[in-house]
Amino acid sequence: MTENIKKIIEEKLTIIKLPNKKKLIEEEIIEGISYKDGHIQISLFANKDNIEEIEFVGKLIKKELQNIEGVISVTTVLTNEPNKRETNDRTEDKKQKIQQINNVKKIIAIASGKGGVGKSTISINLASAFSLIGKNVGILDADIHGPSIPHMLGLKGKPEVNSDKKIIPFEFNSMKVMSIGFLLNDEQPVVWRGPMVHSAIKQMATETDWGELDILIIDMPPGTGDAQITVSQHLPLDGTIIVSTPQPVALNDAVKAIGMFRKVDIPIIGIIENMSYLLLEDGKKEDIFGKDGAKNMSEKEKILFIEEIPLDKEIRESSDRGVPYIFEKKDGLTKDIFLKAAKKINKII
């Protein structure tokens, strides 16, 4: 960062005042400033209680800095540095405590070891299938860094809080829905470390007014990181469903996910193989990503093979329109498979 640009940015930031009339520069919100080739990035400290305030601050910063000569773009990112702040107030109890969610009978995590296997698609359509067989269903989007559930359900806006200070979830066809995506702008990146991810997931799970639910589906992010540890150690999971494609590269990561859940004593309900085959117009199946990969792996790992979901263009199109395929399609092979999977899982849990 050139010294001249740095000085101009700092001077501009000293001008900004918050709604409480205090100067932004005095509130210890700014974590870092970077500038390169006309692009400014401001890192802002965020916690679970000030997300909306920080979002507003980001808008003020962009408005103030975007007119600086030579500046092409201004980006604000949310970050969290637990070692720098509130260390005396953040001494955590080492004992892992399960947070009960009132009035929710069963909680199922939909997980995968690898991204891009269609886990969120499976989550919304499986939840929809449960709804169609008469269950009261909720969906919690636990993918903090890449929430896609709001888009796939066509939901926008910010959630409100009721008189009990509980978050009022959004609804789609009577399904209750909560996601970090409702709290941030679409273009707002989230740069959070473990403690912040942990806090956000727990808050959404336990401080949302879910009402009476038969099943809460938790759409997990890919991998075996902070979000998975938080959900498995702090929420009363009844089991997890692993999603994978038939490809060896996806199956290898699925095995890692299975191993993680077993280590924390979470039952594996079974595995769903997504994009199993492409159904051609003449009725033939084309095994684009291989054949029977998840089925063979389920036998090796001694877990239930739930169903295989075909690669169906209509599923993708429905998600892009913001309507689950299960609700939009009146009948068809893929819909029958999802309903069959829901009934099979319902018997197990």
Give residue ranges: language-model regions.
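Conserved catalytic-core segment of NTP-binding enzymes
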Residues: 54, 58-59, 214-215, 221-318
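N-proximal, solvent-exposed amphipathic alpha-helical segments enriched in charged/polar residues
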Residues: 1-31
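C-terminal boundary of histidine-terminating zinc-finger modules
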Residues: 321-332
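Extreme N-terminal, non-catalytic leader segments
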Residues: 26-29, 36, 46-50, 54-111
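Walker A/P-loop phosphate-binding motif and the immediately C-terminal alpha-helix
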Residues: 106-144, 258
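Phosphate-binding loop that captures ATP/GTP phosphates
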Residues: 130-192, 198, 205
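Residue-level signature of catalytic and energy-coupling elements of molecular machines
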Residues: 13, 30, 65, 104, ...
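Phosphate-binding/switch loop-helix module in NTP-utilizing enzymes
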Residues: 184-231
